[in-house]
Structure formats: C-alpha cells, structure tokens
C-alpha cells in the first residue's frame, strides 16, 4: 500500500518543483493530470517528449510513483466530435503514460452530471469509446483504469461488471475505486454491505483507491471534509485492504493543507488492524 495525492490539489507547479513538494509532504505516489498540474502545459497539445522526460526524471529522483496518468475524458458523450476528441486523447495518453512509467491511465466516463435517462442513453457510446481505447491499451501495453461514478454512464456495479466482462482483458482494463463517488444516498446506504459487495465482485481489478470524505449541508450541497469527519465509512474498505498482498495506491483527493498530515495518518491506518472505524480519533 502506498499513500499518494492528486497532484493538482497543490495547484499548478513548475515541472521540476512538484515531485519535491510531494516528497516533502510525505507522499509516495501521485495522480497526474498534466495540464492541471504543471505550468508550461496548458493543454494536451503542449505535451512534448522533453517535458515528459523532465517529469519522469524528477519523480524518479524523489521516489514518487506516478500511480495514475489522469486523462479524464467525456467518453460517453453522444456528440461524435466530442467523443472522437476524447478517444483520440485517451489513446495518446497511453503512450505518454508509458513513457512516464505510470501505473495506469485513469478516466471517468463523462463530464456532466447526468440524470438516469441520460445515463442510459450514454451507455452504448461509453462502451464503444472504452473498446476503442482498449485497442491502444493492448497495443502499447498500458493499462486503462475506469472510474465508476453514480451520475455517469458507468454508474453502478452491474454496469461496471458488464464492461469488464465485455472487454475480457483484466491485464489491461483496471479500476479506480472512489467510494464517495458511488454513495448516492449517504443517509440510507448500508456502507459496510455496499462496499463489501463492490470489493467482493471487482476487487481483483482495483489498483487505485481515491480517498476523500464529505458532508451535505442543509441544502444538500457537497462539502469536502477531513478524512473521518464526514459521512464516509471506510471500515469495509479497511478490511479489504488488510487482506491485499499486492501494491494498492491510496490517493487523497480534495487535499486540504489544514489537515493533510492527519489525513495521511488516517490513510495509513486503513491498511492495518488498528483501524478504529469511520471517525478520526
């Protein structure tokens, strides 16, 4: 188990600065969305072999794993031009990620927040995009990791299993598991049962966990929280992690420097028998 962070939570930095900053903050791994993380890379069009080599060597020097090359694309969008750009960019990212030595290329399956009807309409387009992306993943031998989100076409366990079965290549199609993005009804969900069901079904293809916590205000508006201070219950996830013998990346999203050290301690506790429940002590 390695503890990491979404790099652009620290804002955009110079290429030579980011890895040292993450090392100093005691992280071991990172998720990199290059245009969001680095000055001098305004878009994917600005990625060059020279910049990739700068990033690779700086992270290697600081012993920071690039757990996820983030290329979050609108894969389910019915608009042909939008989807063509999404798939083409995802394919390019396979080569870029390979050059960086990244563990996986990560993506969700949509940009907007979709209602149920639209999620169903977008699913065939999502599936087509994933299949086309997988062709490149296999060609360059760079795993693609898909991230389910309840308001996207990849909305639930059943859809996720359907995609995994249709692709049928566990070596190249992996998963990022963000439990908070699957908690549609925090007030009524039995999280222990829910996360156990997910992990029993697809745990073997999960390489990365996104770790965050939140509360809902009186207007039901999402509010990021320190780990253990919100509605998330990580007990079942902790039990699963304790059994894993392979490397799993735990990446903090929505990092806040006010309680970043406490959050790192919380994440470290998830992998051991000392985890005492959902709330921090």
Where in this protein do the model-derived segments appear?
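Active-site beta-loop-alpha junctions enriched in small/polar residues
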Residues: 6-10, 33-37, 71-74, 110-112, ...
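N-terminal pre-domain/capping segments
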Residues: 1-102, 174, 268-281
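Acidic/histidine-rich catalytic cores of soluble enzymes
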Residues: 30, 121, 131-231
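H/E-rich (His + Asp/Glu) clusters that bind or coordinate divalent metals
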Residues: 226-230, 235-237, 242-244, 248-251
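Active-site acidic/histidine proton-transfer and metal-coordination neighborhood
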Residues: 16-17, 53, 58-61, 75-177
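A short acidic, helix-capping loop that chelates divalent metal ions and anchors anionic groups
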Residues: 37-42, 75-80, 113-118, 183-186, ...
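A short, acidic, flexible beta-alpha connecting loop/helix-capping segment that sits on the rim
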Residues: 10, 249-266
């Amino acid at each position: 188990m390695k503890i990491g962070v979404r790099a652009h939570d620290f804002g955009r930095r110079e290429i030579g600065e980011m890895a040292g900053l993450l090392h100093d903050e005691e992280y071991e791994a990172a998720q990199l969305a290059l245009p969001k993380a680095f000055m001098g890379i305004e878009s994917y069009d600005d990625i060059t072999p020279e910049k990739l080599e700068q990033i690779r060597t700086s992270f290697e020097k600081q012993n920071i794993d690039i757990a996820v090359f983030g290329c979050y694309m609108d894969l389910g969008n019915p608009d042909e031009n939008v989807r063509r750009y999404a798939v083409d960019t995802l394919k390019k990212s396979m080569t870029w990620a390979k050059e960086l030595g990244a563990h996986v290329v990560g993506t969700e399956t949509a940009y907007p927040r979709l209602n149920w009807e639209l999620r169903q309409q977008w699913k065939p387009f999502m599936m087509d995009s994933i299949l086309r992306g997988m062709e490149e993943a296999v060609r360059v031998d760079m795993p693609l990791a898909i991230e389910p989100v309840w308001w996207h076409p990849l909305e639930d366990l059943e859809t996720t299993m359907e995609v995994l079965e249709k692709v049928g290549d566990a070596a190249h199609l992996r998963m990022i598991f963000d439990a908070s993005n699957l908690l549609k009804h925090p007030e009524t969900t039995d999280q222990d049962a829910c996360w156990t069901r997910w992990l029993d079904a697809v745990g073997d293809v999960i390489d990365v966990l996104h770790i965050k916590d939140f509360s809902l205000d009186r207007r039901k508006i999402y509010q990021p929280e320190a780990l253990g201070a919100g509605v998330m219950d990580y007990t079942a996830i902790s039990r699963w992690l304790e059994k894993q013998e392979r490397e799993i990346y735990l990446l903090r999203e929505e990092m806040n420097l006010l309680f970043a050290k406490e959050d790192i301690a919380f994440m470290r506790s998830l992998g051991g028998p000392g985890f005492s429940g959902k709330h921090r002590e």
